[in-house]
Amino acid sequence: MKNISIFCLTLNPEHEKLIEKLSYIPVGLGEKIFSNKCLSDKSELNISNKNLNYGEYTFHYWIWKNYLNKINTTWVGFCQYRKFFVKSKILEDKIDFDNLDNILIKEINYKNENFDCILGNKFSVEDYKISKIIKHHFLDFLLNPKTLFSKKKRNLKFHFDIFHGKGNLDLAIDLLDESNKEDFRNFMNKETAFNPHNMFICKTEILKNYYEVIFP
């Protein structure tokens, strides 16, 4: 018996067959019509009408309300079509659809049993081209010129404020419970890298606790 359930999210019904071939659980999001083999965030208790704002988290809400008790594996994972967890580092030019099934994580081996969560490679905002930021957000540099000369000053909060509106992050952080609020605020103010795409693998019990924190 497999010790992990992995959900693969897609916006395109044409991806269903490949996801099934990989033995992942297909999830169809967005407005297109999927087969009844696909899980969807539109049935039962849901917030699918907020998908434009919350992305994959409308599906996470759906799982929390309608499906969580049906997951009987120790581990649970979430990936996206064309973004998967692989067993080991592999060159991109060595990957194709024919060998995908052999290189993807399908089980959690005993070496990882002591971990609570598995994440993908981090993305560093330090790698973002400064010329692009200056071109579109020159005023922000005038208000805070130190960020022009120090990558560390261009932390996650700096980038969030630039691309998603200044002050919105602080409003969101203020909604967190007291046990997480300051830790997350410090993380955004100090770090310059994060794990993207809302992809993660964790123990199912931890997922339950996670949902209790992020959803009201």
Task: Outline where the language-model segments fall.
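ER/Golgi luminal nucleotide-sugar-dependent glycosyltransferases, focusing on the catalytic module
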Residues: 1-216
